Amino acid sequence: MSEQPHPFARLGQEPVATIERDELKRKLDDGEPIKLVMALNRWAFEAKHIPGSLHFDDPEELFSALDKDNEIIVYCSNIDCLSSVALYRALIERGYSSVRRYAGGLLDWEGAGLTLEGNSV
């Protein structure tokens, strides 16, 4: 079953490019050089996140840490969370060329029984 983005995620804009859980897991398992970025507050990141995830406290820190040709995957809590959509759009607008959204986010990852890291796990 393919998850559909929240209807507001596409209002007046191009659709958001996405990645499914199985492909993301394969990339992580294979050690591919992706940049997986959690688009939630620091406290949420510290509580739980997908292993290998990055977190940035402000956009300028993020933009200076990532190269425009990095493969970047953004996620947040679940398919209805728009933080990852906003981050996706900000990266695209800044000229990052390989950005996708893991729409299912933490809820989908945890629901599949996959490993999480953090102080609430």
Task: List each model region and its residues.
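Glycine-rich, highly charged phosphate/nucleotide-binding loops
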Residues: 54-60
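Short loop/edge segments at beta-strand edges and connector loops
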Residues: 20, 57, 103
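Active-site neighborhoods of enzymes that stabilize oxyanions during catalysis
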Residues: 113-121
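Catalytic cysteine-centered active loop of the rhodanese-like fold, especially the PTP/DSP P-loop
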Residues: 63-110
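Short active-site oxyanion
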Residues: 30-36, 51-52, 71, 97-98
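A generic "binding-loop/recognition-motif" signal
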Residues: 41, 59, 105-106
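Flexible, polar/low-complexity N-terminal or interdomain linker segments that lie immediately upstream
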Residues: 1-44, 120-121
